């Protein structure tokens, strides 16, 4: 699959081949893992497995842990999110101390969402293999690293051996050419891509995003893009590293320095697909065609531009898609033929490993400034990490949000998933900057619409979905 001549390779193939430890006929190749990120939910059983067998963590210096999934965003009290959360966090503290793993706990200034702190601290570097017991590990692919989520038994295997059995994936190139219009962000680009491919369009593939619109994105934007590669069914997402990547990484805590930095950059510049490399699948989009996106259904592929009408199930020729649309509209309590700008919301969530970085908060604050959250709407802003929160506060973004009636919270995964106190009640409708709109994802019976941070802020101040391009053009 994805075979090319021995000379020409895709970026994915270069990364994969560079990490093969052992390969034999009829066996899944064994890959070396450069970085293992750990959080409180998928690690307790893995550490218990090591303990039962009397095994150490093989490379504690390449293993980093944080608390994020079930932490409270209102207090740093470990007891605040309930008994199960408390046990998981206490187990993580105990396990990291026992096995010598660095832990960014609730009181650490760098604590935050695992996929925010990895890049922020320079743990994530181009050319690496990176795993975490979390499906959105694909985020780190923005740096030209092969990053993917693993299950708890695989977490144990990596802790014990620093390796993982991993078959070769197919390759897909997604090219977004041209320039996006005003107000269009990486979130809109990736939702438009998933709208085109469908939520299973990337199944079995590792996706490389390229084209002038991708090259123009900041690292934050590229992380948003790769974060949601998983939402089109892909194993991982990649963007080739370039000067934007190197400028972001330089001087970060775990980034190399001096001569090692120069050597690193020289190697990282080779991490790109060869000009004649063959991809199994190629998808192209014109950036100029992309409008602000809003999901209407219960998977990220059920998405439309904010100025389009909600589709009727009978407009889908595929019977599976038609049935899925019918079920989604019933769950979401929406009618075909209307625009989402006519649909009122109850809650707004700005945060998650998709959109909780400084650039995201700036975009939301620009819309919130001088406006007020609509009556009856609860809007929360959850920075992705301690450093993001500190930077936002240094720039006065917290004051803008609070003045507009948003709640300014502590870092964590928050309302992205119903594993802490931030969740939807049955029937509540939320404009969310997170990555999944499945049934019950944000709370049993909750209705999730995925949007960009600016679109979420626009919905908060309007009380319904709104076209951010009209709002930002209007005078406050």
Curated annotation (Swiss-Prot):
Database matches in Pfam families: Aconitase
| Cofactor(s) annotated in UniProt | [4Fe-4S] cluster
Q: Name one GO molecular function term.
A: metal ion binding
Name the keywords, alphabetized.
Answer: 4Fe-4S, Amino-acid biosynthesis, Branched-chain amino acid biosynthesis, Iron, Iron-sulfur, Leucine biosynthesis, Lyase, Metal-binding
State where [4Fe-4S] cluster binds. 353, 413, 416
- Function per UniProt: Catalyzes the isomerization between 2-isopropylmalate and 3-isopropylmalate, via the formation of 2-isopropylmaleate.
Put simply, this protein is called: 3-isopropylmalate dehydratase large subunit
Q: In the record, what lineage is assigned to the organism producing the protein?
A: Bacteria, Pseudomonadati, Pseudomonadota, Gammaproteobacteria, Enterobacterales
